[in-house]
Regions:
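Generic alpha-helical secondary structure signal
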Residues: 38-42, 60, 127, 131, ...
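Generic preference for hydrophobic/aromatic residues in regular secondary structure cores
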Residues: 20-23, 159, 313
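PAPS-dependent sulfotransferases, especially Golgi type II membrane carbohydrate sulfotransferases
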Residues: 185-336
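PAPS-dependent sulfotransferase catalytic domain
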Residues: 1-193, 197-245, 251
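Arginine residue identity/basic-tract feature
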Residues: 12, 17, 33, 90, ...
Length: 336
């Protein structure tokens, strides 16, 4: 069981890498969600299947909600994830990136700087240090701080409380090894250790909106993306000695066909691609996201908002405070 702004999209990718069959149910109501879950469970009877529950506010009414949750067995193990509430609020604020002027993501190498400037100006973060007050804190209890509301339906289940700090790159692999033993799924492969150290979610990054960028050359075009495409060749190693990383994400440089690309053409392509990367890095460097300290500073000066946030947060932490006070104590910003 999870919620928005907790890193669960990346966690799902890690679980799938371990051979687990799972799918995000999204913002769908009870009957549709039941059908999706049922079909997921019977689609591969030989695999390790799990159901993911989040955003349950999408139920039409209370009766429908109760009916849906009554279909779950009470003798299954449950994993429920938690994160420092201030870090979670930071994530949801930073994930709000809005389109200003729709712009093509196709960059013509003959107008590269002009095209890139147009693209970079087409998006902006909705929230900054000066307008955090525009965010409605009650949204938290509808989509993000929902653990306490979910747990009421699983009181008899064996519950594993996961601190999402434990899927950060430096400890993610060992965490999955422990979870594999506890829940009985396949352990992550030793050869995959680097995979678990990579950032997987673009949710708070401008790259989610800028990518894929297509750079059009005279004889071909290439695509910059943070995803690996099996249908295209990644030529990043042909162009650069080191892995290309922007905003913490590994970047792939895809092309349909590498035939007829001599060293002269590759050198020219590298120059233009380097310029695109440079402009992306500079934009991200000068358009920094909010930090937890910014939110703490805002709440320090807004007494009524501070009361509302604390009331919502503390209600949602009742169970974990009872069973895993050590996790709550480890949250630096919540303690502040």
């Amino acid at each position: 069981m999870a919620a928005h702004a907790m890193g669960c999209a990346a966690f799902r990718i890690f679980l799938q890498r371990c051979g687990i069959n799972t799918q995000w149910s999204g913002f769908i109501h009870g009957a549709q969600r039941y059908y999706l879950n049922y079909n997921l469970l019977i689609s591969n009877l030989d695999s390790y299947n799990i159901l993911e529950i989040g955003e349950y506010v999408t139920f039409v009414d209370k009766d429908e909600e109760v009916k849906f949750f009554s279909t779950f067995s009470k003798n299954k193990k449950v994993l429920i994830s938690y994160k420092d509430p201030l870090s979670m609020i930071r994530t949801i604020l930073n994930a709000n990136i809005v389109a200003l002027n729709p712009c093509s993501k196709v960059i013509n190498c003959s107008h590269l700087v002009e095209n890139m400037n147009d693209l970079l100006k087409s998006y902006s973060r909705k929230y900054n240090k000066n307008n955090i007050n525009e965010f409605d804190p009650y949204v938290l209890q509808w989509q993000m701080l929902i653990q306490e509301s979910l747990l009421q339906y699983f009181r008899g289940c064996e519950t594993y409380f996961l601190n999402m700090d434990d899927i950060k790159p430096q400890v993610c692999f060992s965490t999955l090894e422990k979870l594999a033993v506890y829940f009985g799924f396949n352990k992550p492969e030793i050869s995959d250790q680097e995979f678990y150290k990579e950032k997987k979610s673009l949710a708070t990054s401008y790259l989610l909106y800028f990518f894929p960028i297509v750079i059009r050359f005279d004889k071909c075009e290439i695509e910059l993306n943070a995803k690996e495409l099996t249908s295209k060749k990644d030529i990043s190693k042909l162009l650069f000695e080191d892995v290309v990383v922007i905003d913490g994400h590994k970047i792939c440089i895809h092309i349909d066909n590498i035939e007829n690309l001599d060293q002269k053409i590759l050198a020219s392509m590298k120059k233009d691609i380097s310029k695109v990367i440079e402009m992306l890095e500079e934009f991200i460097k000068t358009n920094k996201p909010l930090k937890e300290e910014d939110i703490l500073n805002y709440l320090k000066h807004e007494k009524e908002r501070r009361r509302i946030y604390r009331e919502i947060i503390d209600f949602n932490l009742k169970t974990i405070k009872q069973h895993r006070p050590d996790i709550v104590a480890s949250w630096k910003y919540y303690q502040e």
